[in-house]
Swiss-Prot record:
SUPFAM superfamilies given in the database record: Pseudouridine synthase (SSF55120)
This protein's record includes keyword Hydrolase: no
Record keywords, A-Z: Isomerase, tRNA processing
Gene3D superfamilies per UniProt: Pseudouridine synthase I, catalytic domain, C-terminal subdomain, Pseudouridine synthase I, catalytic domain, N-terminal subdomain
Xref: PANTHER family: PSEUDOURIDYLATE SYNTHASE (PTHR11142), TRNA PSEUDOURIDINE SYNTHASE-LIKE 1 (PTHR11142:SF0)
Subunit structure: Homodimer.
Enzyme class, broadest EC rank: isomerase
Name of the featured protein: tRNA pseudouridine synthase A
Catalytic activity: uridine(38/39/40) in tRNA = pseudouridine(38/39/40) in tRNA
Length: 246
């Protein structure tokens, strides 16, 4: 048995998410079907995590096993991309890995990025690649709030009701916020995240930056561990899985 890692870029707008579901198109299925066809055996593609419907990836990581060693990885990559590029998916690389490697369990850190367009006009070049917010946001207050998210804590406030993670305890390694010409990028780094955690944190940071909440209220909401107190999650279109670190 041979194991291979696949690095993937995709626009999630027209997909039900990464994972195969009973209805709708998934990124996992699109690639898995093509791999099985070209390798002439049934393969299962295992991702580093599940991105929700509408969420994009700059570099998703996955792996698959096959019975025969692949002799020409570049040829396989080109063949797959020929059929999936027009669907908004690109395979960036295919690498041979040890059988000990696991796209999900071997991950040391995951990095997500959220983009906000804080300006009057909607984006055209990056349509459906960010959250358009007209009201001026207080970036400095947002940065102060982001520090309250750091460290190991119970993130139940930001956990979707459908989340099946065993524990709500996560360790947020870093939250970095950059703003230039109305474009705001918020980067989150942690070993793993709860379902809708990033979008819920962004939604709550927006409430803070709009002065709907003050820092005291923001911290209270975090510590409450009550989903009902959380601000509405930010839309999926602004979220990107940026990188998985092993």
């Amino acid at each position: 048995m041979f194991r291979y890692q696949v690095l993937i870029e995709y626009i999630g707008t027209n997909f039900v998410g990464w994972q195969i579901q009973s209805k709708g198109k998934s990124i996992q299925k699109e690639i898995q079907v093509k791999l099985s066809k070209f390798l002439k055996e049934k393969v299962v593609l295992i991702g580093s995590g599940r991105t929700d419907a509408g969420v994009h990836a700059i570099e998703q990581s996955a792996h698959f096993d096959c019975k025969k060693e692949i002799q020409n990885l570049d040829k396989l990559l080109k063949s797959i991309n020929h059929f999936i590029n027009d669907k908004g998916i690109s395979v960036l690389a295919i690498k041979k890995r040890s059988l000990k490697f696991h796209a999900r369990h071997s991950a040391k850190q995951r990095i997500y990025k959220y983009i906000i367009f804080n300006r009057l006009s909607k984006p055209s070049l990056e349509k459906e690649r960010g959250w358009h917010i007209i009201k001026k946001l207080d970036i400095e207050l947002m940065k102060k709030g982001s520090k309250k998210l750091l460290g190991t804590k119970d993130f139940s406030t930001f956990r979707a009701s459908s989340c099946n993670a065993k524990s709500p305890i996560k360790t947020m390694k870093s939250v970095n916020i950059k703003s230039k010409d109305g474009r705001i990028e918020i980067q989150f780094k942690s070993q793993s995240f709860l379902q809708q955690q990033v979008r819920s944190m962004v939604g709550s940071l927006k409430y803070l930056a709009e002065n709907k909440w003050d820092l005291k209220k923001f911290e209270f909401v975090i510590k409450s561990k009550k989903r009902i107190l959380c601000a509405p999650p930010a839309p999926a279109e602004g979220l990107f899985l940026e990188k998985v670190i092993y």
